[in-house]
């Protein structure tokens, strides 16, 4: 438990300074900005979208670049970014960041290819685990629909993670951050619904509506206002910590009756350790693989104990439900 809590607070402290890197040392340099202005003036249309005819031979976009809608201004920014990186390296300075991000080599038009690939791995991991859940758990089991809802929310979140890392713009960023939080919020919702699975449908419907209303309100807030990275990070951490705390307390209470409680503890311990990757901040290896991409890779594997827990729990809840129906009202 200490590992998870410590990781939450360490990342929370780290996030408090996150907004300071929105403008980074690379894009603040006069070298980069002069390069960008000259490039756009010489090569781009007035709106910055089209590459002028005389510059086409210098900016030969692939079909993937065009598919991802890389504009002339984007190409200038990309080229000037690498010229600035070379200038820093020639002076033996540290690799700079640009607009809060490390420089990445584009591949097939993808802005952060490793994060795209690992986000896809996460999506497939949820699909695979959901199929396993459906094979091993009967539809009439308690909490069956809740875990389906969790999978749907998670799959949607990873779809937008793929989109965002493929092409970073204000819209894809908003959707990625929003739906990533929906997945964190969903873990808290699943915990609450699991604790209340024997209560009336009216109470559960009211709580479900409260969760939905809260998420919609949060989405509207970060959409119409100025997006705050520190607020988003803190909100994720607090929500995740509440979920982890709830499961830890539940595990302590049922540790003798439900030996599979270790799986949910294992999930949160692994999650807490994986979050430490977000604290590592180094230039991308081969200009592709950075700490954030490694974090996405790590989360691919830690979903297995969570789904395994859900399978064991739903099956045992169904058995208990059967015994209750025949008059044996006792938890196994």
List where the protein language model places each region:
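Multi-pass alpha-helical transmembrane bundles in non-GPCR membrane proteins
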Residues: 19-332
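N-terminal signal peptide
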Residues: 2-5, 10-29
């Amino acid at each position: 438990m200490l590992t998870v809590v410590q990781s939450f607070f360490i990342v929370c402290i780290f996030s408090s300074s996150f907004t300071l890197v929105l403008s980074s040392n690379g894009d603040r340099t006069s070298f980069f900005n002069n390069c960008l202005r000259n490039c756009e003036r010489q090569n781009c249309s007035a709106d910055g979208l089209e590459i002028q005819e005389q510059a086409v031979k210098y900016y030969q976009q692939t079909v993937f670049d065009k598919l991802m809608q890389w504009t002339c201004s984007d190409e200038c920014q990309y080229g000037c970014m690498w010229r600035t990186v070379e200038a820093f390296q020639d002076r033996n300075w540290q690799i700079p960041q640009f607009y809060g991000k490390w420089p990445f080599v584009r591949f097939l038009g993808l802005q952060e290819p490793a994060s795209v690939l690992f986000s896809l791995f996460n999506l497939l991991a949820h699909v695979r685990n959901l199929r396993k859940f459906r094979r091993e758990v009967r539809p009439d089991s308690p909490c069956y629909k809740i875990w389906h809802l969790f999978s749907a929310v998670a799959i949607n979140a990873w779809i937008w993670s793929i989109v965002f890392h493929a092409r970073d713009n204000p819209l894809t960023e908003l959707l990625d951050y929003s739906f990533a939080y929906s997945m964190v919020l969903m873990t808290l919702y699943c915990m609450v619904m699991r604790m209340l699975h024997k209560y009336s449908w009216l109470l559960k419907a009211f709580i479900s509506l409260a969760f939905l209303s809260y998420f919609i309100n949060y989405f509207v807030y970060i959409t119409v206002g100025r997006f705050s990275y520190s607020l988003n990070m803190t909100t994720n951490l607090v929500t995740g910590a509440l979920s982890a705390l709830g499961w830890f307390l539940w595990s302590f209470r049922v540790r003798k009756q439900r030996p599979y409680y270790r799986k949910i503890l294992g999930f949160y311990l692994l999650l807490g350790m994986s979050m430490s990757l977000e604290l590592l901040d180094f230039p991308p290896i081969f200009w592709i693989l950075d700490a954030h991409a490694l974090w996405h890779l790590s989360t691919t594997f830690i979903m297995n104990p969570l789904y395994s827990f859900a399978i064991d729990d739903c099956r045992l809840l169904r058995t208990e439900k059967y015994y209750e129906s025949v008059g044996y009202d006792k938890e196994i």
